Design a protein with these regions (language model features):
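PEST-like low-complexity, intrinsically disordered acidic/proline/serine-rich tracts
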Residues: 14, 20-299
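Bacterial N-terminal signal peptides that target proteins for export
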Residues: 1-12
Length: 299
């Protein structure tokens, strides 16, 4: 988020966030109940994609994942991971978690308390994104657009907010323990037609959503990128960290990512943030609306 973020969008995000804490029962469907194939591009511009065909392949036989793919926008600024009652244009549903089946992140008791502390509206402006810092991996690729450039030795993933990861397809071991990165250290390999990205060495600072979810610096994250046809890319992410969670859990993109045509121009755009950034002001204003007694007194 940056200067394009509007007050109404922030208010909607906060309202859905607060509503997401209400238990929901008897819900079916994933990713906010959106219909399959109803993907809406993050910034998608350009013509509709050509009809789907066979999976494109590289000379070595692996799928060619090069291109621009758009996920669903419905959950883009809330990234609702768990079951939620809906509101503000977001349909009630199970969120993005597909395992465990109940759609609830399996936090350790202390970690759940920390998540709730971060979720409290008084801590809303602690979100690093409001400071023009990085999203986490899931927040980058579960919505919006993903630009991918396939190669023999390296695979470049360019996600939302111009956050780029270079996946080393040859290296077998991760960086030394002391090197900690915002998006971790990604190394990749192929399992049949699925590209697997294995990441460790996180610095623990990004949040998974505006709701304060986190996975900690010692997380081990495995992503799977699988093409269904020439226009459709499925993505899942499995997270494990025994210090934070009671078991591993898996989320997926809001909708299957579909190929966007003529969208390379988005990669070339300069995505400014510090210049004219208004996120912190919006987040603080939301807090003061909820707690007017804590608002600064007029001089």
């Amino acid at each position: 988020m940056n200067s394009r973020t509007t007050p109404s969008l922030c208010i909607a995000a906060l309202a859905v966030l607060l509503a997401a804490t209400v238990p929901v029962a008897g819900q079916d469907g994933r990713a906010g109940g959106a219909a399959p194939g109803a993907a809406q591009g993050g910034r998608g511009r350009g013509a509709a994609p050509e009809p789907a065909g066979p999976i494109p392949r590289r000379p070595d036989g692996h799928p060619d994942l090069t291109g621009t793919f758009s996920g669903g926008l419905q959950l883009s600024h809330t990234v609702i991971l768990e079951a939620h009652p809906g509101g503000f244009g977001v349909t009630a549903g199970k969120g993005l978690i597909i395992d465990p089946p109940d759609g609830v992140i399996p936090y350790q008791p202390w970690a759940l308390a920390e998540r709730d502390r971060r979720r409290d509206d008084s801590n809303g402006y602690e979100d690093p994104v409001g400071h023009c810092e990085f999203y986490d991996i899931g927040r980058v690729h579960s919505f919006g657009q993903t630009y991918q450039f396939d190669g023999d030795d390296y695979f470049i993933i360019h996600g939302n907010q111009h956050q780029t990861r270079v996946v080393d397809m040859k290296r077998k071991t991760h960086l030394p323990e002391g090197i900690r990165l915002w998006l971790g250290d990604p190394i990749g390999h192929w399992e049949g037609d699925t590209m697997v990205v294995d990441s460790t060495n996180f610095n623990g600072r990004p949040r998974m959503a505006i709701g304060g979810d986190f996975y900690g610096p010692d997380a081990h994250i495995v992503e799977r990128w699988t093409m269904k046809d020439s226009n459709t890319l499925n993505w899942t992410m499995t997270i494990e960290n025994p210090k934070v969670f009671t078991r591993a859990w898996t989320m997926t993109s809001a909708l299957p990512m579909t190929r966007a045509q003529n969208a390379r121009e988005n990669y070339d755009d300069e995505d400014t943030c510090h210049e004219g950034n208004v996120d912190l002001a919006h987040l603080k204003n939301l807090y003061y609306q909820v707690h007017p007694e804590k608002a600064p007194k007029a001089q």
